[in-house]
Amino acid sequence: MLDYLMRKILVTSALPYANGSIHLGHLVEYIQTDIWVRFQKMQGNLTYYICADDTHGTPIMLMAEQENITPEKLVENIHKEHLKDFQDFHVNFDNFYSTNSLENKELSENIYKALVKNNKIFEKEIEQFYDPDKKMFLPDRFIKGECPKCKTKDQYGDSCESCGSTYNPTDLINPYSVLTGSSPVKKKTKHYFFKLSECSDFLSNWTKSGTLQKEARNKLEEWFKAGLSDWDISRDAPYFGFEIPDAPGKFFYVWLDAPIGYMASFKNFANNNKLSFDDFWKNNSNAELVHFIGKDILYFHALFWPATLEYSGYRKPTKIYAHGFLTVNGEKMSKSRGTFITARSYLDNIKNPNFLRYYYASKLNDSMEDLDLNLEDFSVKVNSDLVGKFINIPSRTSGFISKYFENKLVPIKNIEDKKARELILRITEMKDLVLEHYELRLFSKLTKLIMSQVEALNEFVSTKEPWILAKNKSEHKTNSDLHQTCSTCLHAFRLLSIYLTPIIPELSSKISLLFKENPYDSFSNIEIEAVEINKYEHLIHRLDLKNVESMVDSDNK
């Protein structure tokens, strides 16, 4: 059994980049994090969920240029869109901010100055590709050419999609600028570097401190053996971002100020809510700092980020939880494969966010394995589990309580049937296991555990046949059996609904109304017993496969 004493926890999800819409791949992480945060809050832990849009970099500068608006206006528009998508999927941030903020500028500059003071920054002349027509240095993804290993054409400047090789942009054969099509020239420039190579001993010890999953530690060991390279933290103008102090025309690379955005978002939240920033970020803070990320940004979060914090005087993360990628029908998400789906397209066509939240939960665990959204399986599973089994319980039994017993439930202590009492007791006593699965992010195990009891409850209903009992209810024994059978089912259903609240919060709120209660905001609701119900109203509609097909079509035309 886990220790559930009151904790202080600051939780983050990776910052979505402000150059496009939220898609179903993004939502894996935000739903996973939101479930865990809701669980912690229902436990009574002081928990804050912080995020922000990642707003800096060349892609945003160029996108704004194409749309003939300022980068500031672009990221403002994207922020509104992102926030609406998250809200409609019931991802409940305490603060969703922006890295293009005064707080982030101040923190980035102060952290940089601390790194300089600690002799962790140096200047070096490097050679990069430069587009003479656009008059700018080209990031890796804005250069294409032939792969130096397999000779495949039109590959990006950092890696080959054909053979998987990684390389420097200057290794490309016949390189060209993605922006203008012209041949880039090599040009020397001075950049600022963080001495990551000097941090190997600290990072090697820190990454073994229990902060990371075993798979993540193993991956880091590979990087340690290969040797850590110093990190280029600067970019040349023109660039949308924060200018480096005392370095005109040089800007912080987006990956320096983006994670500092966690701090900035919390600082903004703390200032607006009279909280102490230092209580969560000072070096000896007793609060937990938990990052949820995708495995593709493990290098930044498990190496650059803790080293930056260590040598600028701030606390390090308590836990970093990395998850795998989403595939759709076994394929990588892409328009060319017909597997790219935005959050808004899902909402426009399927409408019910509970379905995706539940399906993702049924697939998620504590590993970095990829998970697949098989659209046919998705439709079958949510219809079977949520509609056919879970909501089937009140739809089969609550009507009898309203029609024959004035909406009153038999108190649990007065239920005489042995199997009925055992059923409720079993569901009540699995609370500790439910909480443990939530804490350890074993959501797949959790949903299986709950569904096993949902199935047992449906079997109980089928065995008792309340619809038959209702026909013979004039007999006292039959009338009592009908009342107790339906009350058993509804008491048990209510308990299971409380367990599922972090996963399907909106549906849980509707269920609480059935029992004339406020939305379930604590697992202590388990100890309270419902005494009567409202008349049953339809809680959920089946998912039509046609809606799934129209969702796919709308994003992949």
Where is each model-derived feature located?
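Short amphipathic alpha-helical coiled-coil/interface segments
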Residues: 78-79, 112, 224, 427-431, ...
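N-terminal Rossmann-like or analogous alpha/beta NTP/dinucleotide-binding catalytic cores
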Residues: 4-124, 135-136, 148, 211
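Basic, alpha-helical terminal appendages of large translation-related enzymes
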Residues: 2-8, 124-129, 133, 142-164, ...
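Structured secondary-structure scaffolds
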Residues: 2-51, 103-107, 150, 159, ...
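Amphipathic alpha-helix face/heptad-repeat signature
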Residues: 382, 386-389, 393, 419, ...
